[in-house]
Amino acid sequence: MTTPLLRAVRVARHYGDVEALAPTDLELIPGETVALVGPNGAGKSTLLSILAGAIEPSQGAVETHARVGWVPQRPAHYARLSARENLVLFAQLEGVREAESAAGRMLERFALPVDGRPSGELSVGNRQRLNVAIALLGEPRVLLLDEPTAALDPGQRRRVWEVADALRAEGGAVCFATQNLEEIEHATRTIVLQDGRIASLTVEEVFG
């Protein structure tokens, strides 16, 4: 039996009387890509944030057996620092050797600006690519992505999916949230969420 790289056991999240996510189980095993699909407010971001450790579940637990990279929807970097400065800083925080060299490789890999502008002044697409680059600095085996290509053009989207598909092919696991039905082709498994619960519906029934 394959040991999951990440396992969520009955995780749920409440905000007061509002149930954002009902108790949910999820395993990510090596070599798979899981798509979380559903309309706005379905619980996709909440589930991913719990898996990433960005928010605490109201109940349940998450077991991680591998390094996790996390790409949230919102900027996960310091707006006053340049792309290079952010990458160097996060590389150091991850304990990456030769942080400057690692930052340089990511700048090139994701075609990020090297002109020293604060990242807060970059385009939405550049900021999102910077999020992905930061998530990959620690060479994670699990990559969690919350609508990572929503602000990207086709070429930029292709670059992100090349990275995610390669990680899966190398025995990692990817879990991503999307409302873009074309991106489901990258998934080996699709989970439909609706009203904070895993739904017994097809993608077509949800988006009709």
Predicted regions: what they are:
Residues 52:
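Helix-to-loop junction immediately C-terminal to a conserved catalytic motif
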Residues 6, 21-23:
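Conserved structural motif at the start of ABC-family nucleotide-binding domains
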Residues 132:
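Hydrophobic anchor residue at the start of the ABC signature
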Residues 100, 106-121:
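Conserved ABC nucleotide-binding domain
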Residues 143-147:
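Catalytic Walker B motif of ABC-type/P-loop ATPase nucleotide-binding domains
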Residues 37-39:
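The feature captures the beta-strand-to-loop junction immediately N-terminal to the Walker
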